Amino acid sequence: LADSRFSPTGSQEEPELADRQFSPATAHVLGAQNSAGLAIQRVDLLQHGVNEFHDIARNTSLGSVEKAQRAMQVIESICDPELTDLASQVTSALIDGKDTPDFTFTLADDLDKERLRARDMLFSCQADQAIEAAEAAVAHLDQVYAAGHGVPRYFNSYAERVVYNRLFATLDERTVLIPDNLFYAHMELADVLSQIKGAEAAIPHLNRMVAYAPAYPLSHLKLAIQLARNEDWDSAPACLNALRVALDRDDAAFAYYRFAYAEWMLDRFDTAAAAYIMSDHIAPGAIGSLESELQELVSRADSQCIPVPESVEAAAHVLATHDLPVWPHIEVADIVRDAARVCVDEDMFVPARTLSVAVARMNDGEGDNIDIIQAQFLRSLSA
């Protein structure tokens, strides 16, 4: 496994720290022109930018003006508002023939300080003040990113980044990575508000999570749960949105489960039963209440002489007839499969691992079904 043929130089380099331009064919499959288009970690991307500034400063073949222009190209490509605010310091240093500073980025740390302060207030029985402080902190950071020239996004994995690139990114979009803790802060606020003030108060933060991470099933599922608490059965589309980007069996099963209940409440017995059956097929026994709910649904359907599917095959047929997703036969399955193959062929093993795990798990069987051959292959990508 340590042979250079199977672990080429640079194959374990993270996309955030690499400098690779992709061929047109690779760019099409990954939805990115270069390795930065696969980045998911803001901190690493910013550090790579700082390192590039130092490299530019040391380049004796460039004049000072050209150095400043190169640095601005880096800043514009990353498009982070905190880095953009430091542009004048970078260009001034390069024009003066000096090295660029080693910047410290503080937006994320400042947010963590406010989150910690809010938690202290919450545990001191100052719930309203805690919520107010936390909401002010996230609102400020939301505004900072909204005022920039890029599209602020959060990604939980490299596989999700590829899915986003292919399904959601617009032509020539400048995707900007937000601090991870901004996304988590919205999630925390949604959880706290849903418990203290009810589902309606949590909805704005859940909508913000969906906006930041449209390729992350958890965002859609949390929104669906709170909509259902409000007996808003239009929560079904949120479940379907989660299902269409689900790369994990548990996510897909839970999305089907939530969708089934929403459909039941809308008296759509056939699709509700189909979704319950698919949920249990994908992750058997994972949801304790599923079996009893399905039995009650079938009983009510029988009492009204409404036919419902009783097998996995029949359930899949019902879903397909209604133009509903039949997991894992969804668009993202082909996207991650092609992307995994390309990343391996292009010696980009870090994103290839995440993509390959997703491919292995997106199968028609029960359980993760990562067999010994797939496990050995995944090990080889870590060598």
Could you tell me what each predicted segment is?
Residues E135-A139, N241-A246, W264-G288, S292-A316, ...:
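TPR/TPR-like (Sel1-like) alpha-helical repeat modules
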Residues D99-T106, V138-L182, N207-Y212, R244-A252, ...:
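Flexible helix-coil transition and linker loops at the boundaries of alpha-helical arrays
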Residues Q73, G97, D109-D112, L116, ...:
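"A position-specific structural signal for the A-helix of alpha-solenoid helical repeats
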Residues M121, L193, L227, E263, ...:
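Residue at a conserved register position within TPR or TPR-like alpha-solenoid repeats
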Residues E82-D85, L141-H149, Y216-H220, L247-A255, ...:
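Boundary/linker segments of alpha-helical solenoid repeat arrays
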